[in-house]
């Protein structure tokens, strides 16, 4: 799986302490390297205390939804995510790490409960060619933090066969709705979500070269702070 180049930079201000949650899934070292390149102090660990106390928590994920949820449950991941968000502490999900934030995943008729941070179902995309593997543009909403400063034709690296095909959260005038970014591979699917302290991307920023580095830098600066 190719990784585009990402230039090393010095992150301005205080260094953010980031934990990449090690629950047996995900491109842990790729995520660690990408975050270090944009100036973060990164620890890869399953330790609950470290995950709760970090400035930001990254939840990566590759493979099957059910396997990722089993790994998360084994390290008390859903509780860690809940506790962080209750305190307004940033969490970033990547690829299947985004998918498990939804209510449920359905793979080959097997249904698995997710972390239920957002309503919705992860299911197989209706595309002629799967997996969706390679570079693709996204359609980010006005006001996006993650994609600030990036052109509309910027491409990100995807590799997945399943995704969120419908956004199911009802709009409420009482709260600010999440910002949802879309991409298309045979049909539209959710490419990213920005919801206060909770952010997620279906694509791999750690494998998306300078574009992915910009997304991670925006997250560190404007969400983690």
Where is each model-derived feature located?
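Extreme N-terminal starter segment of soluble prokaryotic enzymes
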Residues: 14-19
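Acyltransferase
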Residues: 10, 198-225
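Beta-strand-turn-beta hairpins that frame and shape the catalytic cleft
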Residues: 153, 194-199
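Pocket-forming structural segment of enzyme catalytic cores
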Residues: 103-183
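Short acidic low-complexity segments
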Residues: 42-53
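Short acidic/histidine-rich motifs immediately flanking catalytic phosphotransfer sites
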Residues: 51-61
């Amino acid at each position: 799986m190719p990784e585009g180049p990402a230039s090393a930079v010095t992150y301005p201000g205080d260094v953010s302490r980031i934990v990449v949650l090690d629950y047996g899934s995900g491109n842990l070292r790729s995520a660690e390297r990408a975050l270090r390149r944009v100036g973060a102090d990164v620890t890869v660990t399953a330790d609950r205390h470290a995950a709760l106390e970090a400035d930001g928590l990254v939840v990566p994920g590759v493979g099957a939804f059910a396997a990722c949820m089993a790994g998360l449950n084994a390290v008390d991941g859903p509780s860690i995510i809940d506790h962080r968000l209750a305190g307004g502490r940033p969490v970033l999900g990547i690829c299947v790490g985004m998918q498990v934030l939804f209510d449920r995943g359905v793979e080959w008729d097997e249904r698995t409960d997710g972390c239920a941070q957002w309503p919705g179902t992860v299911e197989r995309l209706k595309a002629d060619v799967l997996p969706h593997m390679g570079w693709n543009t996204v359609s980010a909403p006005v006001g996006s933090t993650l994609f600030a400063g990036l052109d509309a034709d910027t491409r990100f690296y995807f590799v997945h066969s399943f995704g969120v095909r419908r956004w199911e959260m009802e709009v409420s005038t009482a709260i600010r709705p999440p910002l949802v970014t879309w991409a298309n591979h045979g049909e539209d699917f959710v490419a990213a979500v920005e919801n206060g302290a909770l952010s997620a991307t279906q694509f791999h920023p750690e494998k998306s070269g300078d574009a992915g580095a910009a997304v991670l830098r925006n997250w560190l600066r404007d969400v983690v702070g």
